């Protein structure tokens, strides 16, 4: 148990560092990033509170009859995504305790879930939400439920499977790691399964999942027409726009069907391992991670900036799976290498070289150390890249501020040239080209609204 905890904590920390690659997407939205971080922390605190009182059998004390409903209410009130998750995770814990462990549940647990539902309703039905929708997203507000799903579903699925766009440390990287780890561990655990039909089913599904991951990896090599066809099977098009322009086309649904099948099979693995290990936390965290992303299918804004809670839950799943593999001596390093290769072939080669080199030095039961080293190497690499890009953009930012102040002080005409950032996704947005940002800049510095802002590329 101690080994499991140590392994999980180390890997969770390394993945947190690695995640700077995707965190860059939200860093310049400081208020939003802070909100997502705090609401995620609130959700995890509430989940642990419930888990400790229900599964860990921590004695319910008098203060819990006040604190637990209050925490549940405020967790339900945090935001649409975490609000739904607070209810969903609470229900899963109740199902596990009542129907799997067949244990009595204290009434305060039901009361807490009721308060979470009330908090969720306060959040969702608040008049301000409707006003914001009408003002900020008027077109989206006019869609019915089916149209909203058709408009947003490609972003939700793309964030889980589009490894080309989001890179190392992005959500697809963690999703594919989960798919692979779940498949291998399920296969190995099923070898001791007494139910032969279940054993064969799990093994067949595990093999199919591994083949899928390997085909995705091969598609990154662009070896021939047939592989390119498979590569396009993970290309998610906007369903609503496609329907409006061309009518119903079943072919665009193929990527969604494939991706849905992959997620459902992975959920089967997560539930199976949870039952075999008699630990509900793995299944609940994994299914909740997918639900957290799925909720965004009816979101008016891009789900990119709200992936933090999904990634956070997947970190826990990966760390827990790695600790199981460590204690049961199950080899999972190969999947890690393949997943690095899926993101970038060069990453795959580097991780393979590190894996082979360390395997020749360390004993075979130390594979988990190798995995930690590989993740650590790329985590440091990501931080160095982001820090360098941030410094470059920072110098441009201060140069633009200097130009604006000089323009205001000298009243130099009706055109103001501002430098374009090196890369928009590293901490700073451009000042030119987005009307609301231009208006904010002019208003803050007292620039005449008639002044034209012109973007100047760095030579």
Outline where the language-model segments fall.
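Short hydrophobic alpha-helices at membrane interfaces in multi-pass membrane enzymes
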Residues: 52-73, 110-111, 329-337
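Transmembrane alpha-helical segments
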Residues: 1, 40-54, 87-95, 177-185, ...
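Transmembrane catalytic cores of multi-pass membrane glycosyltransferases
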Residues: 1, 63, 80-88, 95-270, ...
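Membrane-interface alpha helices of multi-pass inner-membrane proteins
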Residues: 63-91, 162, 335-343
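Membrane-interface micro-motifs in multi-pass membrane enzymes
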Residues: 7-51, 79, 248-266, 291-321
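Intrinsically disordered, polar/acidic, low-complexity terminal segments
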Residues: 1-7, 104-113, 226, 333-334, ...
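Aromatic-anchored segments of alpha-helical transmembrane domains
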Residues: 13-20, 72-76, 116-124, 208-221, ...
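Signature aromatic-anchored transmembrane alpha helix within multi-pass, membrane-resident enzymes
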Residues: 200-210, 255-267, 272-286, 290, ...
């Amino acid at each position: 148990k101690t080994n499991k905890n140590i392994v999980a904590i180390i890997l969770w920390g390394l993945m947190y560092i690695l995640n700077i690659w995707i965190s860059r997407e939200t860093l310049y939205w400081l208020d939003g990033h802070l909100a997502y971080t705090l609401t995620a922390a609130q959700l995890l605190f509430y989940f642990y509170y419930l888990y400790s009182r229900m599964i860990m059998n921590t004695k319910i004390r008098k203060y819990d009859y006040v604190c637990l409903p209050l925490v549940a209410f405020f967790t339900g009130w945090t935001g649409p995504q975490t609000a739904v998750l607070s209810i969903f995770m609470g229900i899963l814990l109740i199902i596990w305790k009542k129907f799997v462990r067949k244990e009595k549940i204290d009434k305060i647990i039901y009361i807490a879930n009721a308060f979470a539902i009330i908090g969720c309703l306060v959040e969702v039905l608040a008049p301000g939400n409707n006003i914001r929708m009408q003002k900020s997203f008027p077109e989206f507000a006019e869609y019915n439920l089916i149209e909203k799903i058709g408009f947003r579903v490609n972003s939700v699925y793309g964030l889980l499977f589009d490894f080309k766009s989001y890179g190392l440390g992005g959500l697809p990287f963690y999703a594919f790691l989960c798919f692979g780890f779940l498949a291998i561990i399920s296969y190995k655990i099923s070898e001791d399964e007494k139910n032969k039909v279940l054993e064969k089913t799990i093994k067949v599904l595990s093999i199919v999942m591994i083949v899928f991951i390997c085909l995705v990896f091969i598609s990154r090599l662009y070896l021939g027409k047939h592989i390119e066809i498979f590569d396009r099977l993970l290309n998610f098009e906007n369903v609503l726009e496609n329907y409006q322009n061309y009518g119903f086309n079943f072919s665009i649904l193929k990527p969604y069907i494939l991706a849905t099948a992959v997620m459902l099979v992975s959920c089967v693995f997560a539930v199976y391992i949870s039952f075999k290990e008699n630990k509900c936390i793995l299944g609940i965290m994994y299914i909740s991670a997918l639900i957290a992303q799925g909720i965004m299918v009816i979101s008016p804004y891009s789900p990119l900036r709200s992936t933090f809670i999904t990634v956070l839950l997947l970190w826990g799943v990966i760390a827990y799976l790695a600790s199981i593999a460590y204690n049961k001596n199950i080899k999972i390093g190969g999947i890690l290498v393949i997943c690095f290769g899926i993101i970038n072939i060069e990453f795959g080669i580097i991780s393979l070289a590190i894996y082979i080199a360390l395997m020749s030095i360390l004993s075979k039961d130390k594979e988990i150390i190798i995995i930690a080293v590989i993740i650590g190497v790329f985590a440091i690499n990501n931080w160095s890249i982001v820090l360098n890009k941030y410094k470059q953009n920072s110098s441009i930012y201060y140069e633009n501020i200097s130009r604006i102040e000089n323009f205001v002080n000298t009243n130099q005409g009706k055109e103001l040239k501002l430098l374009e950032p090196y890369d928009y996704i590293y901490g700073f947005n451009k000042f030119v080209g987005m009307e609301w940002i231009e208006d904010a800049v002019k208003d803050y510095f007292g620039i005449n609204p008639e002044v034209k802002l012109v973007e100047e590329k760095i030579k």
